[in-house]
């Protein structure tokens, strides 16, 4: 795993976001797709326990990186997993915060309540995520943070290829937070990025996770990267896609 991971120079993307970059004319829409499955309670180095639990590190990093994203960029949050094992565990994905403006505080607040549990319905989550962009002009850009492959016997790469065949352009940058994941899992995550025209990053520390998110955002909004990103008119969603309503989490006990 990780042979094709994008190499990052620590801190460069975050600095560029803060100091200013040449922006695209076309609007950018960014959806953070966050893995909340059971294994996200493990440490970033693959061992159990503290100090850098994968989901906790992701939530902490998001607090900082969201502040660096320009206020006119639309951002949203969808999660998958985050449920006790049951018959419908392979359909557990929720749009917690729809893609929009002036919602950074809401994203941070709702992310803070998340706990790692359940399976990894990655393919189903990507299908639902694609529908989240319906009606939005501009580019579709997903930042997927995950520690492994789909555990619901689905292949997300098949779905991404299908979208491409249908002419539905959606870039997925993938941040893998388990450096010790099995080869098959690493291949699946890298495949999602490759097939969508995105990039794959490895992040085994909180610092690397932050750099990867900043780099992905930079790619989404900078004019320099425009030729590599997917173009964005308002397109009707393919018939295969259906959207779920925003989900309200019940208070944690």
Name these PLM-found stretches.
Residues 113-114, 148-195, 202-204, 208-212:
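VWA/integrin I-like adhesion module and closely mimicked acidic/polar interface patches used
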Residues 200-253:
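C-terminal "exit" segments of structured domains
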Residues 52-72, 77:
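An active-site-proximal "capping" alpha-helix that borders the catalytic cofactor pocket
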Residues 27-29, 71-75, 135-141, 166-173, ...:
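Loop/turn elements at helix/coil->beta-strand transitions in domains of secreted/extracellular proteins
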Residues 34-37, 58, 77, 129, ...:
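DG-centered beta-turn motif at the end of beta-strands
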Residues 19-20, 43-55, 64-65, 94-98, ...:
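Second-shell loop/turn segments in exported
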Residues 1-48, 97-101, 127:
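Acidic, polar low-complexity linker/tail segments
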Residues 42-44, 72-110, 131-136, 153-156, ...:
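Short beta-strand-loop
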């Amino acid at each position: 795993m990780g042979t094709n991971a994008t190499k990052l120079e620590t801190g460069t993307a975050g600095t560029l976001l803060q100091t200013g970059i040449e922006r695209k004319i076309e609007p950018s829409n960014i959806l953070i797709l966050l893995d909340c499955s059971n294994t996200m309670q493990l440490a970033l180095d693959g061992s159990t326990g503290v100090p850098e639990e994968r989901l906790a590190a992701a939530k902490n990093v998001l607090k900082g990186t969201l502040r660096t994203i320009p206020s006119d960029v639309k951002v949203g949050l969808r999660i998958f997993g985050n449920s006790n094992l049951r018959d419908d565990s392979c359909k557990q994905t929720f749009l917690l915060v729809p893609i929009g403006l002036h919602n950074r505080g809401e994203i941070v607040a709702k992310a803070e309540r998340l706990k790692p549990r359940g399976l990894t319905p990655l393919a189903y989550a990507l299908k639902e995520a694609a529908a989240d962009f319906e009606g939005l002009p501009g580019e579709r850009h997903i930042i997927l943070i995950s520690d492994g492959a789909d555990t619901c016997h689905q292949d997300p790469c098949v779905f991404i290829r299908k979208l491409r065949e249908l002419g539905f352009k959606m870039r997925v940058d993938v941040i893998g937070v388990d450096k010790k994941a099995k080869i098959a899992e690493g291949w699946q995550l890298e495949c999602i990025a490759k097939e969508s025209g995105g990039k794959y990053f490895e992040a085994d520390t909180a610092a690397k996770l932050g750099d990867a998110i900043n780099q992905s955002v930079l790619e989404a909004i900078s004019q320099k990267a425009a030729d590599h990103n997917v173009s964005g008119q308002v397109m009707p969603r393919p018939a295969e896609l259906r959207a779920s309503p925003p989900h309200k989490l019940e208070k944690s006990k």
